[in-house]
Amino acid sequence: MKLTCVAIVAVLLLTACQLITAEDSRGTQLHRALRKTTKLSVSTRCKGPGAKCLKTMYDCCKYSCSRGRC
């Protein structure tokens, strides 16, 4: 019985802490779009405009591969 009560109190406490920190961090991320593009360019291995490419590899970042160039 005591163990059940301790477990319930612990779950309620952890839930309350998560809700409090979620409300505190709301609106603090300033440049969401910039972070997304930076993260994408770092996480993928793609080639920039003018780089050599293959149509079957899909390795151009923004452009499609035409005539062997991005």
UniProtKB/Swiss-Prot annotation:
Q: Name one Pfam family in it.
A: Conotoxin
Per the record's keyword annotation, is Protein transport included, yes or no?
no
Q: Which GO terms fall under molecular function for this chain's record?
A: calcium channel regulator activity; ion channel inhibitor activity; toxin activity
Q: Which domain of life does the UniProt lineage start with?
A: Eukaryota
Q: Which GO terms describe its cellular component?
A: extracellular region; host cell presynaptic membrane
The UniProt function text for this chain reads: Omega-conotoxins act at presynaptic membranes, they bind and block voltage-gated calcium channels (Cav).
Q: What is known of its domains?
A: The presence of a 'disulfide through disulfide knot' structurally defines this protein as a knottin. The cysteine framework is VI/VII (C-C-CC-C-C).
Any idea what this protein is called? Omega-conotoxin-like Bu1
